[in-house]
Amino acid sequence: MDVLDFIVEGAAQRSISASRGEIASAFVITAETAADVPAREALLDRAMGPKRRKKSSEKLRRGRRPSEGLAFVARDASGAVTGTVRLWDVVLGEGGGSALLLGPLAVDPTIKNAGIGSALMRHAIAEAARLGHAAVLLVGDAPYYERFGFSAEKTGSLAMPGPYERHRLLALELVGGVLAGAQGTLKAAGRKLKAQRLPLAA
């Protein structure tokens, strides 16, 4: 199943769920803006708890901006942020190829069975493919992410820069065979955050 199949399948599933009245709230997915940052951070705190910044994935995100055009939020009818996902540029080991690291993916914990997480995933994968990226990696639960094509099959020789459970390092090839032979520890890449300048003392 290729990326377009994921999108079509996901749209069909959402249509069926909507006809059954299973979707609890309407939402749209848009590009994240600077104004969304406080709401996004508050949502992540609620959904993932205070230890989220200690995860090994955070070492690859710290001090970096998301990959260009790959930061999204879900909004409800009032415009409030109800979900978030971002993707980050990484390098596969020393002198390795480039890829994306997806995460964190989070949905407002008060909203259940609305399809927000799945919609964010499918949108993110489709945009990553459209922008020409070759592979997406993440650390997460295989039973959930397998539905989007992720598996640990191609990550056996790859590692995160910190403690993690190896079986939870998953990958999706957007270009077939691009992860063949990939090995080493993932390294942060992409755009760095600009350091804030402190005002000079009088």
Which stretches of residues belong to each language-model region?
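Short amphipathic alpha-helix that is part of the acyltransferase structural core
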Residues: V3-I7, A12-K59, R65-V81, G95, ...
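Conserved beta-strand in the GNAT
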Residues: A71-V73, A80-V91, S98-A106
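Conserved acetyl-CoA-binding loop-helix of GNAT-fold acetyltransferases
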Residues: L102, V107, N113-A126, L138
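Conserved active-site alpha-helix within GNAT-family acetyltransferase domains
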Residues: R130-A134, V139-E165
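A contiguous, mid-protein "functional segment" used to position or interact
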Residues: A152-G184
